[in-house]
A protein has these predicted regions:
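A short beta-turn/loop motif at secondary-structure boundaries
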Residues: 31-34, 181
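Extreme N-terminal starter segment of soluble prokaryotic enzymes
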Residues: 1-2
Length: 200
C-alpha cells in the first residue's frame, strides 16, 4: 500500500525525500488520533508517506504508530504498510504484536489499521503495518503523477527466514526482497525521472 519515511519534523522529512528522489511531494494532512501529520508522493497504485509528530495537536494517551514517540535522528525509511481486503483475517495469520484494528479517518479517507499496543511492529518494525481501506477512496488515486515507481523494497533482518515465513501467507510481491543481515534495515529503490534512486 505505502512506505513510511519517519522524521523528527515534517519539514525535515520532506526535504530529505525531495532531495533524494528529485521530485516534489504533494499534500497530506493530520491524524488527530495519533497526533501526527504527513506529506505524500504518488507511486502509481502505491504511495510514499513522510510522517512526523504534529506538535500542534494534543499528544495521545497511547503510543503513536510506527514507534514515532521514540524516533530520533535523521529522516529514514522505518516502515511499510500492506493493504488487505480482510484485516481481521490477515491479523489471524500474523505474528503476535501486529496490533488490533483501529478505525481512522483523514478528510474523506477512512480506513482500519492494525496498531500495536506499544507502537512497535514485530521483527523490530520490519513486519508491515496492515491496513484495510473503507470505500473506494485511496490516496494514490488522488495524488498527481510523479513519474516515480517503487523498484524494490529490501528488508534486512537477523531472522530473515522467520520473517519470510510470517509474510508468506499475507503478501506475494516480487519487489519485496528479504535478506539475512546482522541488524535490521529497510532499503527502497525507485525508478524516477532522474534514474534509479534509493532511500533507507
Amino acid at each position: 500500500d505505502h512506505i513510511a519515511i519517519s522524521a523528527a519534523t515534517l519539514d525535515q522529512g520532506v526535504a530529505a525525500v525531495e532531495s533524494a528522489l528529485g521530485v516534489s511531494l504533494a499534500g497530506g494532512g493530520q491524524h488527530p488520533h495519533m497526533a501526527t501529520h504527513n506529506r505524500l508522493l504518488g507511486l502509481g497504485d502505491l504511495y510514499l508517506e513522510v510522517i512526523a509528530i504534529d506538535p500542534s495537536l494534543p499528544a495521545p494517551a497511547w503510543p503513536r504508530w510506527f514507534d514515532l514517540d521514540n524516533f530520533r535522528g535523521t529522516p529514514r525509511l522505518t516502515n511499510w504498510v500492506a493493504r488487505c481486503e480482510n484485516l481481521t483475517g490477515a491479523l489471524a495469520r500474523s505474528p503476535a504484536g501486529t496490533g488490533v484494528p483501529v478505525a481512522l479517518q483523514r478528510n474523506a479517507y477512512r480506513w482500519q489499521m492494525a496498531v500495536p499496543a506499544d507502537g512497535k511492529l514485530p521483527f523490530d518494525g520490519c513486519f508491515p503495518a496492515l491496513i484495510q481501506w473503507q470505500g473506494d477512496l485511496h490516496p494514490a488515486r488522488a495524488l498527481p503523477e510523479s513519474g516515480v515507481r517503487l523498484a524494490n523494497l529490501e528488508i534486512i533482518h537477523p531472522d530473515a527466514d522467520e520473517l519470510r515465513a510470517a509474510l508468506s501467507s499475507l503478501i506475494i510481491d516480487p519487489r519485496i526482497q528479504i535478506t539475512q543481515g546482522p541488524a535490521k534495515d529497510l532499503r527502497a529503490s525507485f525508478d524516477t525521472p532522474h534514474g534509479r534512486r534509493s532511500l533507507q
